[in-house]
Curated annotation (Swiss-Prot):
Its cofactor is Mg(2+). It catalyses: shikimate + ATP = 3-phosphoshikimate + ADP + H(+). Its main location: cytoplasm. Its EC number is 2.7.1.71. Catalyzes the specific phosphorylation of the 3-hydroxyl group of shikimic acid using ATP as a cosubstrate. HAMAP family: Shikimate_kinase. The keyword ATP-binding applies. Mg(2+) binds at residue 15. One of its GO terms (cellular component) is cytosol. Keywords: Amino-acid biosynthesis, Aromatic amino acid biosynthesis, ATP-binding, Cytoplasm, Kinase, Magnesium, Metal-binding, Nucleotide-binding, Transferase. InterPro entries: P-loop_NTPase, Shikimate/glucono_kinase, Shikimate_kinase/TSH1. This is Shikimate kinase.
Length: 170
């Protein structure tokens, strides 16, 4: 499949970079969390509160299975999607996976700046929880086809598009 799949921690810039990449490549943007919200008619926060995390992860798996038929898309995943059910391997079948690696200190700054957030796993700006999440997820994220270690938006954008074109053989 010829898709770009963006993975990484919450607040790593997946949605923002996804929008820009989709404009450059003239690909449709798919945000997995937004798709789940539309399917369920509820926000992610409400889904977690009413049905729990396991239910939400089942919905993510449904989304992955639907995406296997897609091509020429930029897919921005929820931060936990690659982690559960060995989804990282399924995502790599869907397209070129890009891990947006942002230093923990920068993620904490972004979380504090944003304040109370709609992300259910980042409630109450719990920096210790974010730190644990980071440590637990990094090994799986690093299985992506490429890793972008840059907090500069424009440089990241250029690097991702170049790496994708190289992967695709353009």
């Amino acid at each position: 499949m010829e898709n770009i799949v963006l993975i990484g921690m919450p607040l790593s810039g997946k949605s923002t970079l996804g929008r820009e990449i989709s404009k450059i490549l003239k690909y449709d943007l798919i945000d997995t969390d937004t798709l789940i919200e539309k399917m369920e008619g509820k926000s992610i926060k409400e889904i977690f509160k009413i049905y729990g995390e396991d239910y939400f992860r089942e919905k993510e798996l449904e989304i992955i299975n639907k995406l296997k038929k897609e091509s020429n898309k930029v897919i921005s995943t929820g931060g936990g999607l690659p982690i559960y059910n060995k989804n990282i391997y399924e995502l790599k079948k869907i397209g070129f996976t890009v891990y947006l690696k942002v230093p923990l200190e920068e993620l904490i700054k972004r979380m504090v700046k944003k304040g109370e957030d709609t992300r259910p796993l980042l409630k109450n700006n719990d920096t210790k929880f974010l730190e644990e999440m980071y440590k637990n997820r990094i090994e799986i994220y690093e299985k992506a086809h490429t890793i972008i270690c840059n907090t500069n938006h424009e440089e990241s954008l250029i690097t991702i598009v170049r790496a994708y074109k190289k992967w695709k053989g353009i």
